[in-house]
């Protein structure tokens, strides 16, 4: 089964908790704090593997969780950092944040790596909080929670040339005779239901990859037929071979076919029309094909401005192999002078997949539940909250000072909070003291 989209969840490892410990040894009076830091949580890393061809591995395994770091230890020893979880993906995988739709990365090179979820840093042990005023602190931090996100994966096959056209115009036959690929061929619509890939070698020794894509029909850009399921694969191609059945064996007008397919390409992604097209007039061994070709050329010229350059037209027969060598040489020549096309605008890409907080991000938000409990929320606040060790009084007091420094007490008071009101942060409830 060919699978080219998948939605998965990834969870990086939490940082290990810092430790509260004190040095207690004979002949070492006033040993002081000795608790070490927790280890870093493991990242979730995507690694490109050229041996993979589909996203099939993600059909049943949709959850990926990295290990957490070890806790800090006595003698000031740090906990061990967790190993990264490395997930193999095929070449041509685009990774999006499922919530925002932003493109995180486009993985196209073998061995390329990208961190899709960052592990949390280890919490600090009490040795880190020693000061002249507090030489024996009973303060430690919990490890930072690892990043958790839902991802949308899209596989767009890597090919230099894409074959497009209506069903049964001869795309699969053409691919089978110009490459060693063995696509499924039949005298019925949608014989090809997955993209097929083959390598072409011209008489002059040049080579390039060709993809035979499932046939398009009118409305494909809106999902009709196989629709957008396979239109995405055209995006990576640099040259489009537009295959047209000049025999009109299906009862359609070849020129109307040409217009209809271009309309679908344009509707799906305007940039597809920036790619150079070669018109391949196929089935020229059939009766009336030559007459239809002359009519096609006439209509094409009528709809082009006199200063516009007409697309190149190559009459061929996939069955008899007539005209194939000339077509392949011209395709190779066009590829040599055609650059790669950007798949995404910069606005579609995250500048950096970084797990952290924006300087201008609001520290917290205040709301009120139906039971009159004040609720404090916000990513920055929850990070501090989750890293607080509430088993230690000094850690609790430290969090209270941080919350006050962020303006929490003042903001609650401004919203009308009174002495004795309940305040909820996460699953914990506190009493507001004015």
From Swiss-Prot:
EC assignment: 3.6.5.-
Extent of the signal sequence: none
Chain residues that bind GTP: 165-172, 190-194, 212-215, 282-285, 317-319
Residues bound to Mg(2+): 172, 192
Stored Pfam families: DUF1967, GTP1_OBG, MMR_HSR1
A GO MF term: magnesium ion binding
Cofactor(s) needed: Mg(2+)
Domain Obg as annotated: residue spans: 1-158
Domain (OCT): residue spans on this chain: 356-434
Subcellular location: Cytoplasm
Gene3D superfamilies: GTP-binding protein OBG, C-terminal domain, GTP1/OBG domain, P-loop containing nucleotide triphosphate hydrolases
Residues annotated as domain OBG-type G: 159-336
Top-level taxon in the UniProt lineage: Bacteria
GO biological process: ribosome biogenesis
InterPro entries in the cross-refs: G_OBG, GTP-bd, GTP-bd_Obg/CgtA, GTP-bd_prot_GTP1/OBG_C_sf, GTP1-OBG_CS, GTP1_OBG_dom, GTP1_OBG_dom_sf, OBG_GTPase
Primary enzyme class: hydrolase
Any single Gene Ontology cellular-component annotation: cytoplasm
Keyword vocabulary terms for this entry: Cytoplasm, GTP-binding, Hydrolase, Magnesium, Metal-binding, Nucleotide-binding
CDD domains documented for this protein: Obg
Matching HAMAP family: GTPase_Obg
Protein task: An essential GTPase which binds GTP, GDP and possibly (p)ppGpp with moderate affinity, with high nucleotide exchange rates and a fairly low GTP hydrolysis rate. Plays a role in control of the cell cycle, stress response, ribosome biogenesis and in those bacteria that undergo differentiation, in morphogenesis control.
Family per similarity comment: Belongs to the TRAFAC class OBG-HflX-like GTPase superfamily. OBG GTPase family.
Subunit and partners: Monomer.
Annotated protein name in UniProt: GTPase Obg
The organism of origin for this protein: Streptococcus pneumoniae (strain Hungary19A-6)
């Amino acid at each position: 089964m060919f699978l080219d989209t998948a939605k998965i969840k990834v969870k990086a490892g939490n940082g290990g908790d810092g430790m509260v410990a004190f040095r207690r040894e004979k002949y070492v009076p006033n040993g002081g704090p000795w608790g070490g830091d927790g280890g870093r949580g493991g990242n979730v890393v995507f690694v490109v593997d050229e041996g993979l061809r589909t996203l099939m591995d993600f059909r049943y395994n949709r959850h990926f969780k990295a290990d957490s770091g070890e806790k800090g230890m006595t003698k000031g020893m740090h906990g061990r950092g967790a190993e990264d979880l490395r997930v193999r993906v095929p070449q041509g995988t685009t990774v999006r944040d499922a919530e925002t739709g932003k493109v995180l990365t486009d993985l196209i090179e073998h061995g390329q790596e990208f961190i899709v979820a960052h592990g949390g840093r280890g919490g600090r042990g009490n040795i880190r909080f020693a000061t002249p005023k507090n030489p024996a602190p009973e303060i430690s931090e919990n490890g930072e929670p690892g990043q958790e996100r839902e991802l949308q994966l899209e596989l767009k096959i890597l090919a230099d040339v894409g074959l497009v056209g209506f069903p049964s115009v001869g795309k699969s036959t053409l691919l089978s005779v110009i490459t060693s690929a063995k696509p499924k061929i039949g005298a019925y619509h949608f014989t090809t239901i997955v993209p097929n890939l083959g390598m072409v070698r011209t008489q002059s020794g040049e080579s390039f990859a060709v993809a035979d894509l499932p046939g398009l029909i009118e409305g494909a850009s809106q999902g009709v037929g196989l629709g957008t399921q396979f239109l995405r694969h055209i995006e990576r191609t640099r040259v489009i071979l537009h295959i047209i059945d000049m025999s009109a064996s299906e009862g359609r007008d070849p020129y109307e076919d040409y217009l209809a397919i271009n309309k679908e390409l344009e509707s799906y992604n305007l940039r597809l029309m920036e790619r150079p097209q070669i018109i391949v007039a196929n089935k020229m061994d059939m009766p009336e094909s030559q007459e239809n070709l002359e009519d096609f050329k006439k209509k094409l010229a009528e709809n082009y401005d006199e200063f516009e350059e007409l697309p190149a037209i190559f009459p061929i027969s996939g069955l008899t192999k007539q005209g194939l060598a000339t077509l392949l040489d011209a395709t190779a020549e066009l590829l040599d002078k055609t650059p790669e096309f950007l798949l995404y605008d910069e606005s579609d890409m995250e500048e950096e997949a970084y797990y952290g907080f924006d300087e201008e991000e609001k520290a917290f938000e205040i709301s009120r539940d139906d039971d009159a409990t004040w609720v404090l929320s916000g990513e920055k606040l929850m990070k501090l909250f989750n890293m607080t060790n509430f088993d230690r009084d000094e850690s609790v007091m430290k969090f209270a000072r941080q919350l006050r420094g962020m303006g929490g007490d003042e903001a609650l008071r401004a919203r009308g909070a009174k002495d004795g009101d309940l305040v909820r942060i996460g699953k914990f409830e506190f009493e507001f003291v004015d």
